[in-house]
Amino acid sequence: KIDQQNEYFILVSPGDDVCLQESANMHIVTVNWPSYPLWEQIGLPLALKKIKPDLLHCTSNTAPLHCPVPLVLTLHDIIYLEKRQSSSQSWYQEMGWHYRRLVVPRILPKCKKIITVSQFERKRILEALHLQDGQLVAVYNGFNSHFHLQPKAPEITRKYIDSDNYLFFLGNTDPKKNTPRVLKAYSEYLKRSEKKLPLLIADLKEDAIDRILEEEKITDIKSSLRFPGYIANTDLAALYSGAFAFLYPSLRESFGIPMLEAMACGTPIITGNTSAMPEIAGEGALLVDPYHPEEITEKILQLENDNQFYQQQIEYGLERSKLFSWKNSAEALLKIYKGLTR
């Protein structure tokens, strides 16, 4: 929408074009290879030799080791370069970890420009990889426009939870998502709260939840948990809007799009005071030490017991989320593209 002069080719795997729309100067090209490493290292360079673009922008941390055109890379984070993944990682996640550790250090010197998603991550990357300062820039992410303040939609929320008021948490087996401490914080909340709101946990299977509850010796809270598993992206806005608060106290994030989605829907967030979360959520957000479950509990209770403070957090989130959009991101990227193709 912001550039009608240049021509763009979006290269995707089969089936990955469902959310994309072609236009006069935007073309979708399907590249068919059986696995992602082969797709990126063989299929993508072959397709580029046919298209002959002025530059390639790879948007997900890795790129072809032998790229036939000038390369721009978005490096979202370097978590996989900093530490070994935990034993809870799936086989697919483990292979992805090895692939990134192999590819990333080898392609960075070949990049004309490297983009990351926050000033926090930019600083970490510069320190860890000793890049030239001008080679690495931060361009903030945006979030989809269908996340906005809207009336409650019980016809959607009741598909996932049998309550009109609840706490909302995007669960994950990734240790950085801090699921065990969130559940410990919720256990303490149930002991101290008069309202005892249920906790809706998205995208986490019951067996994974059961393991955490048993390890933390808090199996008694299971009846207050709702775990529908996968939640369609089209339903997320309604679930944010229906939630009393959104819990996002990760141990580490390079950006944290869900925080902005919840804020834009008028839902107060509780997030971590580490990594990029204070930068994105801002100083007015409810920031906690994610390693201390009692801090998470206290913030939930503060929201519950102080309606004026609760309303202030709603207003703060609505205003804060206006600072971020994909249009802003696209304009920043276009400026980079033009600078490299003059």
Language model region names:
Residues 1-342:
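Carbohydrate transferase catalytic cores enriched for Leloir-type hexosyltransferases
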